[in-house]
């Protein structure tokens, strides 16, 4: 393992003329370490396994069936559709919206490289954005959760069988939820960019809704988990507050509309909303790092001089991940994996890799580098770091294990996922009751349904992965793990001539 760590450091510390060979914008020479195109295909396919609602004729994950067809009916609202966020049967609006923002961003930045996978990626975005339109159909209201998490987690059953309460929770002026509402606005705005050319009418509808939802989020301020704590915590509490989502939402609306109103909003409120906070963890809860990268693009690529300070804010985040520089603040395992938290760490690996590649794209366009404590860091070097992280995920690690289900010869077989771990309805038409399913949860048998493309939480700090279904911290997949990975894989597949 020490050797792997040394090789990792060597890869990211090479002079840029050597790093360019590893991760230049131009095509690579020599064999690719992995089949990135195959991984891309599978990373998008995963979303079909997470679908809730009436499945379309084009559904490729055939062992899944219709589910949640009465969602919202208890309050006479149509909330059918969307995605189950992870291995349960819940629709949590906060991580769902973030997943759609990141999946849309993957398409916006790298969709032009996806070729035959582009339509599948668009379909995945649309399945989510259609649901978010339903969740925001009523002014000054966002329906943010379907299902009682405590009751859902007391059962282990297929989504097609679920009989737990499908309680609906919302934010409105009396129960504000700025964080989840602003994230929903960001998702709608980002999705509008995906469909701007292929479906202009749909894109216009998305951006109009994004504007309305953001206005509501900004006007009625409050953290959604304050009032809804018994229902959304400890699952998806908003630990970082709502300031990051307001900045993030404004950034996406500025990018989607080019309306100077949002530019003014960012300029006037950026510091108050934490633009320069040194929080270097980017995920479903804290969006500061993503917002800094996104806003920096307006300066680097679109030459919006008023946002010049965001180049420095973005550089600060990027430099925190560059090993061997005075600004390095990121922990890596001995095998070379970026390690933030033990619970679902792979989400930070994929989101950070995406931001590294995206920022490298912006820097290359503007012919700029990053100064990390006086050390010049090139776009090629950022790409090298990102590629090493993706390679680790795909199997270049001490265990020789791919953490993407269905990719490679060795991958997790006992993932923490109800639908995957229980027989499909086709194989077992009889209902499997709430408590009956727990036999599968604690079984050592491989999941009968392979959830192709699912990326699990990943190994621990010692690069070890037990592959136990009951170990949700390491064995559970989630939409927000896959969403940014889609963009990273598209870039890598293209750079190696696989697309």
UniProtKB/Swiss-Prot annotation:
Keywords: Carbohydrate metabolism, Cell wall biogenesis/degradation, Cellulose degradation, Glycosidase, Hydrolase, Polysaccharide degradation, Secreted, Signal. It is found in: Secreted. One of its GO terms (molecular function) is cellulase activity. The keyword Manganese does not apply. Its EC number is 3.2.1.4. Expressed in flowers. Residues 1-19 form the signal peptide. It is an enzyme of class 3 (hydrolase). It catalyses: Endohydrolysis of (1->4)-beta-D-glucosidic linkages in cellulose, lichenin and cereal beta-D-glucans. One of its GO terms (biological process) is cellulose catabolic process. It comes from the Eukaryota. The active site is at 88 (nucleophile), 416, 467, 476. Belongs to the glycosyl hydrolase 9 (cellulase E) family. This is Endoglucanase 3.
């Amino acid at each position: 393992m020490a050797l792997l760590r040394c090789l990792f450091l060597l890869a990211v510390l090479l002079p840029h003329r050597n790093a360019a060979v590893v991760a230049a914008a131009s095509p690579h020479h020599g064999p690719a370490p992995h089949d990135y195109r195959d991984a891309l295909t599978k990373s998008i396919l995963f979303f079909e396994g997470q679908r809730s609602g009436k499945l379309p004729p084009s559904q490729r994950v055939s062992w899944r069936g219709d589910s949640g067809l009465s969602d919202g009916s208890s309050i006479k609202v149509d909330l059918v559709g969307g995605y189950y966020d992870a291995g349960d049967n819940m629709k949590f609006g906060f991580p769902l919206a973030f997943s759609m923002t990141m999946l849309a961003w993957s398409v916006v930045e790298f969709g032009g490289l996806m070729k035959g996978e582009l339509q599948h990626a668009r379909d995945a975005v649309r399945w989510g954005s259609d649901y978010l339109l339903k969740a925001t159909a009523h002014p000054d209201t966002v329906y943010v959760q379907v299902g009682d998490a405590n009751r859902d987690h007391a059962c282990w059953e297929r989504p097609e069988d679920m009989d737990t309460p499908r309680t609906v929770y919302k934010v409105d002026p009396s129960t504000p939820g700025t964080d989840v509402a602003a994230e929903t606005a960001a998702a709608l705005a980002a999705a509008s960019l995906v469909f701007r050319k292929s479906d202009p009418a749909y894109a216009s509808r998305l951006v109009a809704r994004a504007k309305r939802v953001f206005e509501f989020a900004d006007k009625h301020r409050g953290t959604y988990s304050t009032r809804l704590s018994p229902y959304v915590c400890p699952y998806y509490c908003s630990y970082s507050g709502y300031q990051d989502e307001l900045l993030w939402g404004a950034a996406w609306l500025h990018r989607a509309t080019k309306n100077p109103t949002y530019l003014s909003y960012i300029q006037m409120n950026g510091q108050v909303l934490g633009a320069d906070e040194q929080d270097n963890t980017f995920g479903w809860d804290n969006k500061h790092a993503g917002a800094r990268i996104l806003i920096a693009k307006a300066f680097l690529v679109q030459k919006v001089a008023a946002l010049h300070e965001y180049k420095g804010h973005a550089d600060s985040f990027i430099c925190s991940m560059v090993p061997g520089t005075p600004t390095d603040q990121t922990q890596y395992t001995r095998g070379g994996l970026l390690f933030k938290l033990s619970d679902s760490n792979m989400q930070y690996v994929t989101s950070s890799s995406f931001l590294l590649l995206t920022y490298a794209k912006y820097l290359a366009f503007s012919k700029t580098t990053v100064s990390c404590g006086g050390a010049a860091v090139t776009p090629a070097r950022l790409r090298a770091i990102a590629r090493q992280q993706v390679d680790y995920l795909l199997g270049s690690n001490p265990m020789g294990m791919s953490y993407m289900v269905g990719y490679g010869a060795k991958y997790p077989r006992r993932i923490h996922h109800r639908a995957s771990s229980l027989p499909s309805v086709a194989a077992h038409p009889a209902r499997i009751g709430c408590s009956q399913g727990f036999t599968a949860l604690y079984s050592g048998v491989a999941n009968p349904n392979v959830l192709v493309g699912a990326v699990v939480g990943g190994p621990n700090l010692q690069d070890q992965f037990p592959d136990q279904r009951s170990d949700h911290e390491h064995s559970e997949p989630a939409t927000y793990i896959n969403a940014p990975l889609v963009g990273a894989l598209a870039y890598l597949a293209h750079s190696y001539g696989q697309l």
